Amino acid sequence: MFLRLLSLFFVFSLVFIPFVIDAQSQDKKVTYKKARALQTSTAKKIVKVVEALERVDENGKEDPDYLTVKEILNDLLEKGDSLRSYDRSVMWNYWAYLYMVEENYPKANEAYKKLLAEPESTIPLRVASLYALAQISMSQGNFEEGVKFILQWMDEVEVITAQGWSLLGGGYYQLGADKKLESEKLDYFEKAIESMLNAVQIAEVEQYTPKENWYIIMAACYSSLKPRIGIEESLNKQLEIYEILVNLFPKKQYFLNLAGIYNQLDRELDYMVTLNMAYQKDLLDKQGEYLALAQVLLSNDNPYWAAKVIEAGRLKKVPVVDEKTKEEKMLPVVKDTEKNLKFLADSWRMAQEIGLAIPIMEKAARVAKDGQTFIILGSLYLSEDKLEEAIDAIEQGLKKGKVKNASKARLTLGQAHFELQNFEQAKKEFRIAARDDDKDIKKTANNWIKYTENEEIRVKNIALRRDYIQNQG
């Protein structure tokens, strides 16, 4: 449960309170009962109860004597009919406290209700009991009763606290979640938001940080209210909440939720920035998260940083449990699959870091199931004037098969042979490419054939001139 039981308020001596005090949170007067005092015999026993609860051991650590407390309270219980109503209310308060310590919530609930039934119970005892009953009820899943008690508490308390509003908001949220009829669900979610906003407002006025859970509940409510307020309004309201959460409580899930909302609203730049913030804070720990950031960086003309993100994911290791052996191993977040390696190599290539792209593409080619990766590798080699390597890679790709466009690969292969002045082999590759049905490829191949023939003649002529000059000498 997101609601936890708070410390309990209890009274054991004289209570002096003004007869009427203005309520700060409502346009009403809160009337207090006259100040009351315990009977002497009851007061003595209550003093012993307090002493037992405040007992410390020889090291000064708290060591409550609950056994003595229970004995004294049982003695008071046996004399219950002879006690005054106020005395019984104090007794029930201590019984409730004891049951809470024992985590016997049904008994604590019963004790608080008996306290409220006492006609002479004072306002401080009543409001503390009502608040505790609201907490107990909600902790036990009885949200309807919990809401009833917190509303009653609000009627009787002088000042409604932020915690009170948040408790009510939590109750409304759970009631909404439990309802089957959509209109009832949405009504409760709206009430939950209103209550949580009141809690946040009070916390801000009193200059302390609102609780994380208050915002979480509001975000969940706004998400559920899509049928009533529309998808865009729902997303914008959630956006406001998550923008607060990432600043106050910078957790991974809040960054991802915020990024997801930006993405749904087509705010790609904000989506990228938010994911990058999570990355910079080292919050990302899943392959999909690293790849999503790299992809959006790449699509926004940041190939260098896309590559850096993927590299970081390859280096970062997280514990993974083997399903068969149940052994925990430290494995890289981003795995060296063919797809991931090609993504990384392409990013380095687009960043003009060909020297970094080549070893990655070499690794991708070794694990590839088809020849296409070798073709890409060959193109990278060619761009770096590694002609022999380019020829070898492209030939391996063509031999392996399943190449996307064999004719284009032949063109690239022919260009590599051309640069090595292997003119006959170059023309052979260009002629194969020229058989393609694609007009552009056919035209390019034929142009290369003519260019190669001309270059071959030029080179031969240069060689003849060189030989002639040497012979003349």
Regions found by a protein language model. Give the residues of each.
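Alpha-helical linker/edge segments of TPR/alpha-solenoid repeat scaffolds
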Residues: Y97-K107, Q135-K148, Y172-F189, A219-Q238, ...
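Conserved small-residue packing positions in alpha-helical repeats and bundles
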Residues: V49-A52, V56, A96, A134, ...
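TPR/TPR-like (Sel1-like) alpha-helical repeat modules
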Residues: L186-Q201, N247-L248, N263, Q280, ...
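Generic helix N-cap/helix-start motif at coil->alpha-helix transitions
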Residues: L38-K48, R84-W92, T122-A132, V157-L167, ...
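Solenoid-like repeat scaffolds
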Residues: T31-A37, L77-R84, L116-I123, Q152-V159, ...
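N-terminal leader/linker segments that initiate helical-solenoid repeat arrays
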Residues: F10, P18-K113, S121-A132, S139, ...
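Alpha-helical adaptor scaffolds
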Residues: E338-N405
